[in-house]
Amino acid sequence: MGFRKHLFYKLISGVFAVSLAFSPLTVQATEITESQLAYEKPIESNGWDSWPTGPSVYAQSAIVMEADTGMILYAKDMEAKHYPASITKIMTALVTLDHCELNEEIEYSYHATHSIEYGSSSIARTEGEILTVEESLYALMLASANECANALAEHIAGSIEDFAVLMNEKAKELGCVNTHFSNANGLHDENHYTCAYDMALITKAALENEDFRRISGEDYYTLRATNKNDEELLIQNHHY
């Protein structure tokens, strides 16, 4: 096991931390001003009785949550709404693992492969291409592949909109307080938001799943040749 993977599992086995510079819901005058304002935001956990003082961070919101118990160790504006972007895919993977076997085959639709924004994260799959759920999850979690998020959503719920319903039901089940999903890949939508506290809950639940830990903890994955692509594709983990 490589050093990075060893470190990854060492970290998630004890404490899970989310410290995210989410996309702000309001735009500040300049990047410098926004960054400084974020740094100067109060840290709620510093006001707790008999609790150690935590550091200031430049993230708009932050949380440190103990992975086993869910105990909050550090909190900074943790329930504020933010746009989650690609960390949405943690929930996409969690809902997928709740509903699918890894060896199920998915035929990628035209909508799944062609509705994503030009230049966004992708592994260049095409209409009619067949991948398994497991292969799609590797591409989702290592390469943040947006067409794979769409294909998983359609495979499970018939449409991305209906899959978002499942995502929101899962969020409610986990106790999320300020989350609403409208798609599976995290591409911007005004009605697609979450908060640091909720993402900690979602990721804590995901890390309890052995398949999620295995897939998201890999350094790389080799995608086999498919019915539409004659060559293998090496997918590298872009997230650490």
What is each PLM-predicted segment?
Residues 1-6, 30-33, 46, 227:
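Serine/threonine-rich low-complexity intrinsically disordered regions
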Residues 203-240:
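Extracytoplasmic
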Residues 29-197, 201-210, 215:
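Active-site-adjacent loops and short helices of periplasmic peptidoglycan-processing enzymes
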Residues 2-28:
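Sec-dependent N-terminal signal peptides of Gram-positive bacterial secreted proteins and lipoproteins
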